A protein has these predicted regions:
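Beta-strand-rich receptor-binding modules of extracellular spikes/adhesins
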Residues: 1-28, 135-136
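Detector for repetitive beta-architecture
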Residues: 2, 16, 24, 44, ...
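Intrinsically disordered, low-complexity regions of eukaryotic proteins
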Residues: 3-4, 22, 40, 50, ...
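N-terminal cationic leader/targeting segments used for protein routing and processing
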Residues: 8, 23, 35, 42, ...
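Extracellular beta-solenoid/beta-roll
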Residues: 26-51
Length: 137
């Protein structure tokens, strides 16, 4: 049987979400991943993948993303990384984070610069980071 969650005066008049017998979900509108905003990041930072899908981090010092324990296989999203007014903050990665060619991630260093890094969780303890998009203005 299908599960239909509707909006309106009668069930199903405007389907908002339906899940069929094969567990295929269909949304009647845009599904928006939650954004976690943290404006003071320095030192070791562990992302909470159960609390949010996307992360906005302002670096106030050098940051190491430590290995999380909350990631879900198949989860994807992005990191928005903002340098503070000083800039030149660096990013180091725990072993669960994997970057293209294993080279790590190089961010923009100018004060107040904004970079975007996509990610997808490939498997337990394996978070694939995409190539950063640098220096948004």
């Amino acid at each position: 049987d299908d599960l239909v969650i509707g909006k309106g005066s009668a069930l199903g008049t405007t389907p908002a979400l339906s899940i069929d017998e094969n567990l295929v979900s269909t949304f009647g509108a845009t599904a928006i991943g939650k954004l976690s905003t943290d404006t003071t990041n320095t030192g070791n930072v562990e992302l909470d993948f159960t609390a949010a899908q996307n992360f906005l981090l302002t670096f106030t010092g050098n940051v190491t993303l430590t290995n999380p324990s909350t990631e879900n296989v198949g989860q994807s999203g992005f990191l928005i990384i903002i340098q503070d007014g000083t800039g030149s903050r660096t990013l180091s990665l725990g072993t669960d984070y994997e970057s293209p060619s294993g080279a790590g991630i190089t961010l923009s260093t100018a004060a107040n610069s904004v970079d975007v890094v996509p990610y997808v969780v490939k498997a337990a303890n394996s978070i694939q980071l995409g190539t950063p998009q640098l220096a948004f203005s």
